[in-house]
């Protein structure tokens, strides 16, 4: 534990188009080599495509996709008496969002569509319908936590 005061998290500026902090964070996670304008263009194109296909509001589909990918519990390794246990722990809200966004971007990068915007749009539409690779990742994490429920008393 640090002896000095704990440094708070930096405030992130909302994105220019939709004024959403979540979307700005998503753009930052998608960004490669500091190319923010490219990442913004990809995200906005993907949101337009999603809104067109689903007939819902841009941010509504994005929020729904994130909600369906957010993990509630995860497992952390804990060494006790020479053996390592996978201990299920609840995920903090900030980490929930970060993991959900990271999993969405990873899943989109692995898809087969032509452009990144198309891949991202398809993955987010799948996530909003509770299917797709990102949702499967969340289910796997939850299943792992459920399987190791017996070690929950090792929490710290």
UniProtKB/Swiss-Prot annotation:
Pfam families: Ribosomal_S7
GO molecular function annotation: rRNA binding; structural constituent of ribosome; tRNA binding
Domain of life: Bacteria
One GO term describing the cellular component: small ribosomal subunit
GO biological process terms held by the UniProt record: translation
Family: Belongs to the universal ribosomal protein uS7 family.
Protein name per Swiss-Prot or TrEMBL: Small ribosomal subunit protein uS7
Species whose genome carries this gene: Vibrio vulnificus (strain YJ016)
The encoding gene: rpsG
């Amino acid at each position: 534990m640090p002896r000095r005061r704990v440094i708070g998290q930096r405030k992130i500026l909302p994105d220019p188009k939709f004024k959403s902090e979540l979307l700005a964070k998503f753009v930052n996670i998608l960004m490669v080599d500091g190319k923010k304008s490219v990442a913004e263009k990809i995200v906005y194109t993907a949101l337009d495509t999603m809104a067109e296909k689903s007939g819902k509001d841009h941010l509504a589909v994005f929020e729904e996709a994130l909600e369906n990918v957010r993990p509630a519990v995860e497992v952390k390794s804990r060494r006790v008496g020479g053996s390592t246990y996978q201990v299920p722990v609840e995920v903090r809200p900030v980490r929930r969002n970060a993991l959900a966004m990271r999993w969405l971007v990873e899943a989109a990068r692995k898809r087969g569509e032509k452009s990144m915007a198309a891949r991202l749009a398809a993955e987010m539409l799948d996530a909003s319908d509770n299917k797709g690779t990102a949702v499967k990742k969340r289910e796997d994490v939850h299943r792992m936590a459920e399987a190791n429920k017996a070690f929950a008393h090792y929490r710290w």
